[in-house]
């Protein structure tokens, strides 16, 4: 029996979005869901207890970073990631592919894998499908990702075609190398850029290998939102309806709603903690850059419609003061609020699917948040 199972509960009559349950070895979680990112086995500044209190079900950790520090052997010795970081809900690990392609100045792609430089000290490293499986098997995540090539955006059709073919061959090698198929579910990653025929080829190749779940990769890499939505429109229908669908690296509120409408079940992004560290927060009325002088004497919560720990206890003026003074507590408060905001947004999305009104919810949310204004900012 596969360790990862998807159960479809309902399809929204208004939009076609899916309400479902993702069953994992560490619990069952409603989808569509947002997964906070804990790159180095921690969601920056937040404790596992706080994440639970917010309602997080699955969190993400990063294969590449944990391989370098502290080393997958140490995590394995600790009893796996769950035990190492004291998290008893779901964990998804990415394959390390994206980091190899985004962090390393120097890299050489060969059929057997990728040679690249360690971004910390410049040492030469080699990552292959087999190595990515070995690391993730040691980490013991509930969901592992296949090692794929992450092409740059934009890329030529010829480059993308070769890349898709290589990713399919690597996916097959990942399945063969996966040592714990009864404990950890391995997802395939559909690539192909913005080319419909290549997405189709990639999806067909991977579906024929019968993974327990599928990710759509190569989006949110700099392409316009319209391109991402168009690619999702022709890609998600190619994936099996009885398996979970995961859109990698996407976390802005508009893209979460638009992704769900296009049949996506799982999302992850560093966005809430990254912008939180810069003093930017998402609220029901749009984006607030808390460092701005106009908040110096604003003694109201970050978001008057939010009941998170931050909004129940602290004011914009106080949080602005902390952020301006580089106080860690300020970053904790903005990060807590932002992660909570996206987890609650997905609860609202699920409720709207239940009531067949996700299209109406989208209109209302976009209007309130300010996405409908000309020159609206991304998040």
From Swiss-Prot:
Catalytic activity: 7-aminomethyl-7-carbaguanine + guanosine(34) in tRNA = 7-aminomethyl-7-carbaguanosine(34) in tRNA + guanine
Co-factor note (free text): Binds 1 zinc ion per subunit.
Gene Ontology BP term (one): tRNA-guanine transglycosylation
Entry's Gene Ontology molecular function annotations: metal ion binding; tRNA-guanosine(34) queuine transglycosylase activity
Keyword field: Glycosyltransferase, Metal-binding, Queuosine biosynthesis, Transferase, tRNA processing, Zinc
GO cellular component terms attached to this protein's record: cytosol
E.C. code: 2.4.2.29
Positions of region (RNA binding): 249-255, 273-277
Gene3D superfamilies: Queuine tRNA-ribosyltransferase-like
Catalytic residues of the enzyme: 94, 268
Range of residues in the leader sequence: none
Quaternary structure and interacting proteins, as annotated: Homodimer. Within each dimer, one monomer is responsible for RNA recognition and catalysis, while the other monomer binds to the replacement base PreQ1.
Function text: Catalyzes the base-exchange of a guanine (G) residue with the queuine precursor 7-aminomethyl-7-deazaguanine (PreQ1) at position 34 (anticodon wobble position) in tRNAs with GU(N) anticodons (tRNA-Asp, -Asn, -His and -Tyr). Catalysis occurs through a double-displacement mechanism. The nucleophile active site attacks the C1' of nucleotide 34 to detach the guanine base from the RNA, forming a covalent enzyme-RNA intermediate. The proton acceptor active site deprotonates the incoming PreQ1, allowing a nucleophilic attack on the C1' of the ribose to form the product.
Name the UniProt record assigns to this protein: Queuine tRNA-ribosyltransferase
């Amino acid at each position: 029996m596969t360790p990862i199972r998807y159960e479809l509960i309902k399809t929204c009559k208004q939009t076609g979005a899916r309400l479902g349950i993702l069953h994992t070895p560490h619990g069952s979680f409603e989808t569509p869901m947002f997964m906070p990112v804990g790159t180095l086995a921690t969601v920056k500044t937040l404790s596992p207890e706080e994440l639970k209190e917010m309602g997080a079900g699955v969190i993400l950790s990063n294969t590449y970073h944990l391989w370098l520090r502290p080393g997958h052997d140490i995590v394995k010795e600790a009893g796996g990631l769950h035990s190492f970081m004291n998290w008893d809900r779901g964990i998804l690990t990415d394959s390390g592919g994206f980091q190899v392609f985004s962090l390393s100045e120097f890299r050489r792609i060969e059929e057997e894998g990728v040679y690249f430089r360690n971004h910390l000290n410049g040492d030469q490293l080699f990552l292959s499908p087999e190595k990515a499986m070995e690391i993730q098997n040691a980490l013991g995540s509930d969901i592992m990702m296949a090692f794929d090539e992450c092409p740059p955006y934009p890329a030529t059709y010829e480059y993308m075609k070769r890349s898709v073919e290589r990713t399919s061959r690597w996916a097959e090698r990942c399945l063969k190398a996966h040592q714990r198929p009864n404990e950890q579910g391995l997802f395939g990653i559909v690539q192909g850029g913005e080319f419909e025929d290549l997405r189709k080829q990639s999806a067909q190749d991977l579906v024929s290998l019968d993974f327990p779940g599928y990710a759509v990769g190569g989006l949110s890499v700099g392409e316009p939102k319209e391109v991402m939505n168009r690619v999702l429109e022709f890609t998600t229908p190619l994936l099996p309806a009885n398996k979970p669908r995961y859109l990698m690296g996407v976390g802005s509120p508009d893209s979460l709603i638009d992704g769900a409408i296009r049949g996506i079940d799982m999302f992850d992004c560093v966005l809430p903690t990254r912008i939180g560290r810069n003093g930017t927060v998402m609220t029901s009325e749009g984006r607030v850059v808390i460092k701005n002088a106009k908040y110096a004497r604003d003694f109201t919560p970050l978001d008057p419609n939010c009941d998170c720990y931050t909004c129940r206890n602290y004011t914009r003026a106080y949080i602005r003061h902390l952020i301006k003074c580089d106080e860690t507590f300020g970053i904790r408060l903005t990060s807590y609020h932002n992660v909570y905001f996206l987890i609650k947004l997905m609860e609202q999305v699920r409720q709207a699917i239940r009531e067949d009104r996700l299209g109406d919810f989208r209109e209302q949310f976009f209007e309130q948040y300010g996405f409908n204004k000309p020159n609206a900012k991304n998040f």
